[in-house]
Amino acid sequence: MKLLNEILGTKYPIIQGGMANIATGEFAAACSNAGALGIIGAGGMNADTLRENIRRCKQLTDKPFGVNIMLMHPQADEFAQIVVEEGVQVVTTGAGNPGKYVPMWKAAGIKVIPVVAAAVLAKHLEKLGIDAVIAEGTESGGHVGEMATMALVPQVVDAVDLPVIAAGGIADGRQLAAALALGACGVQVGTCLLVSEECPIHENYKAALLLSLIHISEPTRLDVI
């Protein structure tokens, strides 16, 4: 099994999560320069802002970086075209099926890596010709399912013949090692990067996170009754 850094051309087998309203071009570039795969979070942007952030990231790093597209975004179609036009190397997706974009992205040489919260979804997406999946457990700060990372990752590893990236509650080398032991090729991290110097959130936000000894992350959820 190849490690994620071998697949992506990065120094470390780590992807920075594409956190909406946080993961700017500057932040993604800083993460890429540090050895991870920086990801621009398109979720809080419009088409023009996304293009500007991609170009800014290119100015700040010569390392690989990617874009995260939330497929429920009203400008998802435009985002899908912009990443092709701007020569983005990796796209991660969430909140929808990327199927209609995969042929265009693959023709442009883009690696396509959807986020999944269940093995059955990973199996379905594998048929589309994607490059890898991010198995994101409920510990994640993002929009996820109900299964914990420790249980989800080996299920997805067993279900698909694709590289699997673990996400959800991963913050240090011990958890990276655990993810590799579960069969993942690397990890995606988000919440733990919020307190980095390069992260653009307010210093009070960072201080609150560092003082939170019980709940370091609070998942974002939408309950349908």
Language model: regions and residue ranges:
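Catalytic cores of alpha/beta
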Residues: 120-128, 151-152, 165-166, 170-187
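Generic alpha-helical structural context detector
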Residues: 29, 207-211, 221
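Single conserved hydrophobic/aromatic residue that forms the stacking wall/gate
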Residues: 214-225
